[in-house]
């Protein structure tokens, strides 16, 4: 099956569908079409590909489960922050640490640096490549050494630069910033024998270039779906000085001639005693080929015995990580542009070309950002959407209405909107009246779908912005729900001191999203990590662990609350025990808090009132305050100062003055306060949205654990 379009058929309820056979196993990017207009579907899975949010689906191959989530010990996936000395940008990298990393504090680990392809980014190897599951499974089966794996965003564009093929000098960023950062923050084994470089497509060319340029740093090279003759020849020519230990080159069977071009070099490496060779897999230039490539490469590398664990006797000097002072304007731009699919978005397209030797020599063409601030003081925003052949295009800003875009140059549509209030705004895009997703604008999860959003800067709100303070770590952890039998994902923030003070224990806040959103909301829409970093750096907040879980739990038995699911039961039976096992918590109620917004606020009240043995601190943001209703009666606590004080150190209740629930929340707050119960209340101009909830967090976090 090639690039032909598949016509869907309308059912009787306004939906379109089609059952298709003959699709090859693997990961498949795809596009949707509305009246012939190419769009992205907001209710289908989305990843970052082709320089934007792009839909995908998976067809599992029979008997191929090496990349599946399995019941084995899971490593930790961490989102780390560093600064590029090449272009002065704040960058994020994803770092995988193996299951033993926290259990064996005296052990050092080899490091694999692995790069994405053109049009993709630092999220690709986790969400598309399933790298963490592949490593978990290989390690559990004893097929690979335990290792740290680092996944970076391989773009290092300078302003007004016009690079050919390689997107800026990312090699210098790897050598001068990334490796020093990793060596400074992780227990790494020293020496080139304990360091590998690999990549796919563009990333394979970068990997080959980096190893040729910095042969003193790497002894292992993985080239997936690529070939660089000049650099491969250079590595061979210096083999006596810098002997390679592993060189694996791979290709899909459909990448005609690539396997033989690779084999011409791998045969020469093998003649020198270098492990690896060339491998070819069913498929084309696509993720299921690269997953298999990673699996095979991970099995080969770091087989040097004890040295790979101790890192001793290399004679390599220590790396020093230092950050240059950052530009505030640049940090602000990145604050308002960051989103779950890409931390430091670039708006580019690739114009494919080849040089006289047949090597890729494409250039990068600037694209419009889907939503950009024109004048923050006037609340003026400009929307840009590419929609070739569309009849109508609209931007639907939640709470404001729809705004028609007009045709502009080169298939773009645009409009300028004034009067947008400060803060965070979800917006939808409609093409010919159909809801779609703009791949060139920030993407979040809201309304039970992928959705675009924009940021109108709040000039007097400094705490939610990226600043050059010590940065905490965001972890992606998997645990099993006893309520549903499913594996759940939670995001966990640990403060900057967590790795530096291994004997220290921390209080914990469980912080929940609202209905229609998920575990990623507080990090990307709520800017929780930025808030915590800045408040801690200013001495205004106690250092704490913050856990953000998926607030949905639907057991097959049907035993769950119709509005809040069985999440509160799951948190008690599974979530808290997992966090206390995994992190250095202070596991008592005096050092445990729960808070949430909207549905998460309702879940918070339900959970903390039912479990006084677990929590002393609570926060309800836009979730109302129930004294009594048809389901529960909390009056014996909320109207009795002595009983309240026995249970709570603090109950924080917040509601925006523009919210539909403001009057009822205010009435119940006043009744509780009139009874002499010292709840903390917070209100201000605000709607039921992330703008207000960020301010709730800013006020709530400094009050905890004091």
What function would you assign to each model-found segment?
Residues 1-402, 407-706:
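Non-catalytic cap/lid and distal C-terminal segments of serine-dependent acyl enzymes
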């Amino acid at each position: 099956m090639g690039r032909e379009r598949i016509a869907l058929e309308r059912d009787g309820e306004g939906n379109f569908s089609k059952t298709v056979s003959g699709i090859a196993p693997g990961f498949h990017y795809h596009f949707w079409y509305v009246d012939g207009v190419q769009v992205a579907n907001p209710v289908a899975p989305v990843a970052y590909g082709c320089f934007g949010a792009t839909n995908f689906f998976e067809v599992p191959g029979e008997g191929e489960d090496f990349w599946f989530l399995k019941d084995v010990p899971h490593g930790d996936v961490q989102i780390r922050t560093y600064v590029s000395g090449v272009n002065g940008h704040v960058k994020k990298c994803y770092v995988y640490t193996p299951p033993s990393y926290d259990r064996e504090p005296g052990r050092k680990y080899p490091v694999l640096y692995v790069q994405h392809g053109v049009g993709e980014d630092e999220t690709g190897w986790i969400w598309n490549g399933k790298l963490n599951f592949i490593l978990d499974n290989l390690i559990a089966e004893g097929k690979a050494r335990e290792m740290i794996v680092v996944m970076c965003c391989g773009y290092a564009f300078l302003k007004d630069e016009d690079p050919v093929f390689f997107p800026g000098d990312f090699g210098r960023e790897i050598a001068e910033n990334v490796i020093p950062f990793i060596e400074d923050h992780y227990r790494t084994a020293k020496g080139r024998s304990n360091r590998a470089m690999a990549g796919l497509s563009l990333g394979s060319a970068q990997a080959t270039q980096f190893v040729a340029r910095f042969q003193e740093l790497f002894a292992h090279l993985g080239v997936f779906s690529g070939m660089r003759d000049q650099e491969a020849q250079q590595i061979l020519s210096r083999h006596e000085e810098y002997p390679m230990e592993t060189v694996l080159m791979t290709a899909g069977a459909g990448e005609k001639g690539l396997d033989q071009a690779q084999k011409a070099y791998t045969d020469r490496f093998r003649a020198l005693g270098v492990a690896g060779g060339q491998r070819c897999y069913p498929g084309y230039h696509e993720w299921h080929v690269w997953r298999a490539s990673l699996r095979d490469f991970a099995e080969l590398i770091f087989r040097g015995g004890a040295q790979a664990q101790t890192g001793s006797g290399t004679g390599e000097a220590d790396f020093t990580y230092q950050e240059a002072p950052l530009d505030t304007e640049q940090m602000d731009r990145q604050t308002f542009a960051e989103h779950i699919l890409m931390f430091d978005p670039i708006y580019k397209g690739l114009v494919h070309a080849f040089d006289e030797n047949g090597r890729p020599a494409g250039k990068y063409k600037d694209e419009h950002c889907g939503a950009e601030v024109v004048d923050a003081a006037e609340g003026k925003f400009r929307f840009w959407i590419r929609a070739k052949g569309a009849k109508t295009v609209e931007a639907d800003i939640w709470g404001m209405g729809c705004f028609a875009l007009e045709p502009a140059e080169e298939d773009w549509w645009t409009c300028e909107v004034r009067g947008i209030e400060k803060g965070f705004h979800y917006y939808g895009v409609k093409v010919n009246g159909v809801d779609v997703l703009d791949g060139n604008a920030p993407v979040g999860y809201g309304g039970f779908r992928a959705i675009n959003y924009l940021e109108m800067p709040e000039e007097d709100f400094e705490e939610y912005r990226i600043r050059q303070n010590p940065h905490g770590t965001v972890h992606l952890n998997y645990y099993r729900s006893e309520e549903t039998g499913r594996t759940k994902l939670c995001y966990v923030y640990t403060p900057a001191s967590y790795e530096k003070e291994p004997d220290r224990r921390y209080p914990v806040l469980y912080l929940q999203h609202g209905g229609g959103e998920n575990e990623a909301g507080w990090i990307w829409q709520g800017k929780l990590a930025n808030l915590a970093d800045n408040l801690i750096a200013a001495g205004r907040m106690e250092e704490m662990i913050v856990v953000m879980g998926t607030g949905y739990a639907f057991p097959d038995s049907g035993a769950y609350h119709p509005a809040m699911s069985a999440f509160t039961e799951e948190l008690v039976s599974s979530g808290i025990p997992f966090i206390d096992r995994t992190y250095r918590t202070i596991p008592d109620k005096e050092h445990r808090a729960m808070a949430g917004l909207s549905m998460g606020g309702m879940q918070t009240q339900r959970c903390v009132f039912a479990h006084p043995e677990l929590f002393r601190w609570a926060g309800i943001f836009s979730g109302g305050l129930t004294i009594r209703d048809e389901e529960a009666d909390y009056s014996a606590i909320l109207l009795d100062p002595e009983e309240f004080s026995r249970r709570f150190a603090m109950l924080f209740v917040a509601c925006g003055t523009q919210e539909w629930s403001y009057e009822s929340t205010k009435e119940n707050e006043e009744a509780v306060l009139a009874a002499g119960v010292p709840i903390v209340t917070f209100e201000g101009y605000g709607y039921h949205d992330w703008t207000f909830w960020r301010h709730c967090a800013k006020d709530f976090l400094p009050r905890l654990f004091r």
